[in-house]
Amino acid sequence: MDRKTRRANFKNLQPRLTRSTKAAADTLSLSNFFATPENAEEVPSCLADIPVQPDPPAPKIKPIRTSNVFEKPGPKPKKAPKLKASTVSTSSGARRGRGKSKQQPSISNFLRNEQIFAEVTAQHCMADNFSADDIEMALALSKSESEKHGRLRLHDDDDAVVDLLDDEEKSTERIRHKLQKYGFRTAAKEDYKSLAVLPVVASKGGRRGKWANRFTSLTLRNPDVQQKKLEEKVSALLGQEMRGKEPNGEDCCLTPYTVITAALKELRAEGESRILREPSEGPIDDLESYYVTDLFEVSRTPAHHLLKNWAAIQGRDFSPERETQKCRQLRQQHELVYAELERYYGDPQKLEEEVMQELDELEKLVADNMIEDDSVVINIVEAESSSTGSSPSKEPPDKRPKMTMEDKENLQPTTSKASLTVPAQSTRCTSPDLFADSEDEPDIVTTAISNEPEDVRNLSMKVYKNVSISERSSSVAEIEIVSSNDEPSQITTYEVFSSDEVKTVSNATQEKISFDDDFIDLTQEFDMVEFNESKPRTPNLIASSETDSNVDNLNGDTILDFSSQEVSCPISKELYAKYAKVETFPVWNAAAEEEDKIEFSLSMERDLKSSEQSSHQLGILTTPNDTEHSSSFSELNFSRNSLRRSVSLSTDLSFKSPLNWKMNSSAEKRVSPAASPYKQSDASVDLTQNSDDENDAILLSDEEINYSIWKGNKTVKDLDIGDDSSDSCFASPVTKKRAIPQFQTEEDLDAFLMDFSTDGNGSQGSHSPNKSALSKERAEFGILDAAPSQPFSLSELQSHADKEKSSDNEINWAEASFLDAPAKPLSRRSSHKFNELLAKISKPAHNSGDDFDEFDQMVFQSTKEAASSAGETSDMPQGLDLLLKGEIKTTAIPETRAPGNQTPIEPQQVDVDGNVYSVRVCHTPKPDFATLPESEILQQLYKYGIKPLKRKQAVKMLEFIYNQTHPIMKTAAVQDLPARSEPIVRSKSTPVIMERPHSQVAKSTSKTLKAIGTKKDLTFNDATGEELLRFSQSLAPSLCDDFETFVMQTNVTKKTPQPLVPLHIAWHNLICANPQLHESVLTYEPIDLQAVYLHLKHMGHRYDPKDLKTFFDRRCIIFRYELGAPGKQAERHVRRHTKKPSKRK
């Protein structure tokens, strides 16, 4: 079977619709098409491979051809357009032809026609250097012309639209003629043979490949030619020299605007104040001259002032506060106080005289109080100080690890830091350097040695301290060993140990145990058995500790030192004879051998309530020696203020209570009360002591310790070792403690305070010259002096007329730490235990005459006015808004008034369980929430912005809110109290303020405070700033809590003109500017959430309402907001109701 027969058979096997039409391969070439003679009867068509029919339906196919010849290929049709069936006779030939005619021309034939014409056109364009855009425009114009005048203008053959492959009349010349008509320069037939290799689209059955590479006249451009044209146009544009017109002088000088309104004429700039700037003058040097600076004060506050973490909010600022007159005045007072302190303590001669006076008093106190049972226990106060390295203010005490029992038992003997040269004689007892740093110790040692005379340098002091300490924090252990010499100089050495290091240094003379050089070796540490048996004549430093692992109470008194008998001693021999029983030790016999272990012990205060205490007792046991020696107490090592203070650490297991100072000077034993110049400022009010402490003594708060730490940082850099040894009167945490047993009861303390108040007036002249400034400085650290010139006593609470006469004795209570934010980093918390002072003082009966406590005395100008206006409101104390405005005077010299203008009304004092309370009566009784009707309960809940609850829950909630705002003290036994239901006591956070002229506000109000739930009372806009709260520049502790998550604004765009403020800072500023809003938050009144949101939005701070709700909920701030209109909700519900039946139908 040959090929033709096989192909015919295959064609017969195909279905009629899918049978491929006859398409000669030679007709696909353009050269064969043009080579076809014109008079040929049958011309193979490139557009449609329609088989030859007797009468082909030319008019029906021609519109498809003419409409697709010059059109761009559109999207691929899913199916080819169907042609109408021709109505011919049903003969076999006709039926066969009709079957053939159903096969429409393939769309690829139309595309091939367009492709061929595009290729021809592109070839001619390249040959004749025509623009392809011009050819496309000519084709479009020709098509539009044909559509305008009809489908074909057949009467004019010259203007007929070109149809390349129309019928048998067309020939090669006709094609060439048509091409010439459009402006093409035709060539010979042989030139078109290169077009025979056109890219024939091979249909591989894929949809993508079927329509790939369908070129048109626009896509067949030469990219190199187009790039060349583009470069030419760009170079032509760049080559043009565009020179602008030089501006004239009149054009540069822009005339200022003409001010029309009378209000703006005041701001019109004069001719000499105008800034005329030429553009050619260069960059602007001073940009500030172009801005207005006299309208408001420009603040230079750093941007991160109010932020907890500046890295959390990058590039954002906050609303800074200007430095007020009050802050400026406080800063100047601080500078004056610091300068005064430096000038006062820099005078060594004056300090030497004061120390000599103290030594006389010291002998009397030692003789009366230190001798008990012929024994002295020598203790070392290892007071906890917050020093780590060179900065003593880095680690709070509550973060320190505890000292375990193993640490106390494993005290390894090490050697001292260095061997110091000390003077041979000392005639005075100077106060030690309380702020020495361990890092500065070598420099201090070398300086001290170099400053000593030659006869002093040959003396070498043996190492006196050899203890390896690994305690819960950095401990400053201080021991002074002073020999005698003619010069009144002294060297004090310190070792500062942190919790993670143990200092170990070498000493060459450690093994030398002798007393030839007038030294006592305290570096040897032995067990008691070994001490008693093998080395009976060696004084030792024995560390004895009780059986508790938590060292929470380290008590120490003094260090007793042995020195030579020949040198002079500041303590008399009679006093010495009381302690040592013998003046010399010429020969030690068996009786002396038995009495050699005499313990010198001091009675120490013990916290009897807590069993979890232990103390390090370093007992010096006198042992025989071959050389004659007299054990004289050449150094009792009291600092100047240790006569009246002692250090005690709380026995709390968690070590949360800070380091406190105790007042421990008995009035009966003091011989010369005016000897010390510092007893005026030593009685300090304790803000940190718990009420259940049984050590009834006045304790010092941790703010004073912060002051001493600050003083140590300041003095250790400026002064030398001689000046540092006698430091400020507010000495440091490292202070010796002297326990006095007479202070175990309240009566002894009251008697001491009474005696102290009578002695205080005689010793005013020895105090610092600037008493008022000194008290202010201490007040900045949270230290509230009872009085700058005398201790707090009964006379201060009784004689108000005397206090008004002398303004120098006034205390500026407004600068106290409970009225202002803490100013120092270690002010961890302000305690509410201010009434511990009143627990030691009982007030007379004539003071209990009214219902007006100290809190109202601080707030109101006149006590009569306050008493008359106290019944106007029962919601909150009168005048609280004035207190929140911060208008309490802070001037050092208050306004004085005649005492006859008003008679002070004293609040009633009640002594309950040793505590003195001021009582006032709330004029509205407490409602019985359990018996209230439902309507009133719902009204009360709505008042506080609480949703309706069940009755049981609502009663509990209302009871809680009422108890928080109305604290009540139930008294067991009340003396001298009229018939009242229950005395109402001030809250523990309320400060006790005595009647003083300067601590009263200048004006009082009779306006009843209202809830600000309504918009008319919520006045946010305060243009004059009268309502603005004046806080200090320090960070408010509650501004940003630990759980704070920064709530940022939602209008964060690139075009936001103002800085983005976090929500907690914006809320803080809003609270400061609106005292009524502040009061509403404090009194559980609901705030209008919508008003706050709109006000912040008006200021440019837009927050998400959900973030606002979360923010207020986390702070327990009650808010109220209006829901949507109920009419819209009902209407929406009705619409839904009407739609549902329609759907069911």
From Swiss-Prot:
Biased composition (Low complexity): 382-393
Cell compartment(s), UniProt: Nucleus
Any single GO BP term: DNA repair
InterPro entries to which the protein is assigned, alphabetical: Structure-sp_endonuc_su_Slx4 (IPR018574)
Keyword Acetylation attributed: no
Ranges of biased composition (kind: Polar residues): 411-430, 613-633, 678-689
Keyword field: Coiled coil, DNA damage, DNA recombination, DNA repair, Nucleus
Bilayer-crossing regions: none
Keyword DNA damage: yes
Coiled coil: 321-372
Chief location: nucleus
Region (Disordered): 48-108, 382-442, 613-634, 666-689
Pfam families: Slx4
Family: Belongs to the SLX4 family.
Biological function: Regulatory subunit that interacts with and increases the activity of different structure-specific endonucleases. Has several distinct roles in protecting genome stability by resolving diverse forms of deleterious DNA structures originating from replication and recombination intermediates and from DNA damage. Component of the SLX1-SLX4 structure-specific endonuclease that resolves DNA secondary structures generated during DNA repair and recombination. Has endonuclease activity towards branched DNA substrates, introducing single-strand cuts in duplex DNA close to junctions with ss-DNA.
Subunit structure of this chain's protein: Forms a heterodimer with SLX1. Interacts with mei-9; catalytic subunit of the MEI-9-ERCC1 endonuclease.
Protein name as catalogued: Structure-specific endonuclease subunit SLX4
Source organism per UniProt: Drosophila melanogaster
Species classification: Eukaryota, Metazoa, Ecdysozoa, Arthropoda, Hexapoda
Gene: mus312
